[in-house]
C-alpha cells in the first residue's frame, strides 16, 4: 500500500476513534436538573420521591438540585434565579401562581433553560411561549370522575336535591376545572343538586376552619367537595368536629395516608380522585430527559393517569401498597 494512502487511512482511523471517545465522554456528562416542589403536602413528597427514583434508575448521570417553594412566589423566584446562574440543563416545577410565576418561568426560558411544569403551571399564553412541557391529569376529567361518584352516592341514598359546599384551591386553574367537571356530571345526573358555597381552604388548618363555618352556617348540608388533599382532609375533620359523621359526606381529591385511612373507614369520606405523586415524578423526569435530548414529540401538554377510589377496600389496598406513606 502506498505510504500516502496508509497515512490517510491512519488519520481517518484516529479521527474515528477520537470522535467515539468524545461521544462517549459527552454521553457520560452529568446533567444538572433543578426541581421545585410547590408545598409540603403529601402529594409533593410523592412527586419528589418519584423524581429521585427515576433519576437513580436512569442510565444517565444526573445531579438534582431541589427545593420546596412552600407556596411562596418569592422563594420560587429566588431559587429559579439560582438555577439560572448555575446554568442547569432543565428546571422542573409546579408553579406557585398562574400569573405570578410567569416572569420567573420567562427568565429561565430566555436564559435557554427548558422549563417542564407538572400539576400546576403558568397561564396558557405563557405555557405556549416559555414552557417545554406540562404534565397534568386532565382536571375536567378529574372532576367528572368525582362528580360521578357523588351522583352514585346521592342516587343510592335517594337524595334528589343535595346541598354541596366546596372547599377550593382555585388560585390554580386546575382546581377551577376540577369543580367545573364535578358540577357538570353531578347536575346532569342529579338535576336538583346545588352548590351552596365555595370558599378557599387549600391548607389543612384553614380547610378545617372553613369547613366548620360552612357546616354551622348551612342548614341541611349534605356534602362537601374538597378540591385538594388539604381541603379534603380538612373537610373530613370539620365534619367529625361538628359531630356530623354519617350525615355529611365528603368527596375529595389527592390520596395521602390519612385520606386513605378515612376512605377505609368510609363513614365520612366516600370517594377520592387521585393522580399518583410518584407516578407523576417518574413521568416528569422521563419527559425532562426527552426535552434535554431534543427527543420530545409535538405534544406540549401531556396527560397522566387519574385514579378513582370509592370503597373501604380501595383505602385498605392503597395503604398496603404505600407503606412509606407517599402517594
UniProtKB/Swiss-Prot annotation:
GO terms for molecular function: carbohydrate binding. It is found in: Periplasm. GO terms for biological process: transmembrane transport. SUPFAM superfamilies: Periplasmic binding protein-like I. It comes from the Bacteria. GO terms for cellular component: ATP-binding cassette (ABC) transporter complex, substrate-binding subunit-containing; membrane; outer membrane-bounded periplasmic space. Residues 1-26 form the signal peptide. Keywords: Periplasm, Signal, Transport. It holds the Pfam family Peripla_BP_4. Gene3D superfamilies: 3.40.50.2300. Belongs to the bacterial solute-binding protein 2 family. Probably part of the binding-protein-dependent transport system YphDEF. This is ABC transporter periplasmic-binding protein YphF. It comes from Escherichia coli (strain K12). The lineage of its organism: Bacteria, Pseudomonadati, Pseudomonadota, Gammaproteobacteria, Enterobacterales.
